[in-house]
């Protein structure tokens, strides 16, 4: 504690924060404390987003934090606050998106790596890398150096990490006049079972009762 207080925080934090949906937390008082103490809190969000914010607050002014976590925050509505948090702080140094590449054999989660600091950058761009396949550990640094591109993210849109050709195409599509008035369409979540374990079963279970 003395060293922590003397330095004003940690020099480096490396973490794999827990993934847990906030809406599953039944303790209302605990949930209210989270809402009152975290800027990126969203009632439909996930605890890992709060861990990212907390990690930054535990750093000293020159500290760096690196986290491997879910990549859902890049595009989901509950990730809006976290994305804007990064943009306002201008502290996101590097972002790696593994898409559907299986990183953990024991966990079914699409992952990303976040590297950030408490110091503001001199640019609005973020160094980004997209992985579509598993590569050898020895080739990781080389792959990142060869395939990273600088992306300027918008506070109003989901974040897409792709190659320059794809990003340029997306920009062109955004600039096409909206003749169909698509902004009037409201797309919401589809039907929910309410209890997946009861309604989504393997083929073996129906055979037992037939």
Question: What are the roles of these predicted feature ranges?
Answer:
Residues 3-209:
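Signature of N6-adenine DNA methyltransferases within the class I
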């Amino acid at each position: 504690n003395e060293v922590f207080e003397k330095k004003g925080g940690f020099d480096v934090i490396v973490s794999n924060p827990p993934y847990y949906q906030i809406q599953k937390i039944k303790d209302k008082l605990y949930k209210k404390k989270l809402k009152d103490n975290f800027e990126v809190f969203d009632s439909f969000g996930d605890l890992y987003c709060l861990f990212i914010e907390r990690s930054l607050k535990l750093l000293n002014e020159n500290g760096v934090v690196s986290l491997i976590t879910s990549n859902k925050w890049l595009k989901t509505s509950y990730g809006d606050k976290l994305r804007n948090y990064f943009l306002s702080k201008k502290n996101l140094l590097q972002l790696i998106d593994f898409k559907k590449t299986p990183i953990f054999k024991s966990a079914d989660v699409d992952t990303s790596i976040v590297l950030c600091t408490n110091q503001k950058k001199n640019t609005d761009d973020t160094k980004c890398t997209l992985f579509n396949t598993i590569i050898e550990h020895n080739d990781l640094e080389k792959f990142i150096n060869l395939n990273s591109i600088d992306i300027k993210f918008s506070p109003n849109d989901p974040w897409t990490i792709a190659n320059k050709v794809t990003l340029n195409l997306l920009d062109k599509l955004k600039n096409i006049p909206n003749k169909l008035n698509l902004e009037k369409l409201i797309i919401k979540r589809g039907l929910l079972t309410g209890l997946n374990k009861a309604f989504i079963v393997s083929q073996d279970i129906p055979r037992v009762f037939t």
